[in-house]
């Protein structure tokens, strides 16, 4: 027997509590329970669970998240547009997102996504963070497969006192590949803190520190849509070393409830990221089907982003206008 999840959700993406049957837009919601049942470890793992959302070029074999909504591709130079707790998080350099500190995923489909700043015509993804709890909990997960892909993650949350609680999440991945000379490694650390200032006011602090490194791999070339080399063949240079991404993110959110109908939300986020490394990439396969032109690039990109947002949410009785 299956159970249907309550469709009335307090959505940080749509800014209000609603029943999905009563709003004029298409929204797919993946809860923590669904992600655990389907063993979702990365955003890519969740795409097969949502209609109209498809994986796209992830930049050299997985250096950032990228997908399309309803056939509309996202920015090829920055990856997919997404928000976290209602604020943009994917501007500039961004490492692939880990879901160890994600409570739920919201996929907003259609032009409504354009209401939230840098959006796409096809849609937008919102990441809802897990929050510190006032009951002590810990969780350890281990994962391995026959392709020498290993992952370990640890989560812990506990109260400090009646007003303060913290949460820590750590994850490490070491991934080999069926392709020659291709591998990747990632460290992820996320400390969070919640302060209940009063019954009506709460302050939340989230942070993420991601370091991702791996072989930049463009795949293999084809001639007339046919493979002309073994799919395992790496066409770059192993001596180039790894391409490395450092992605550090901080978000501070303040919420104050004036009464059951009116609420003030204010937030600020800061993001600092860097991508650096050499990579030799295939450029063009010549007509003989045997000669591959290549080019060697050095990337040293940095990005810094600051975002602030304040919202006043409330209910207004418009029955007089009916």
What are these regions (language model features)?
Residues 3-18, 26-28, 75, 80, ...:
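N-terminal, post-signal-peptide soluble/periplasmic segments
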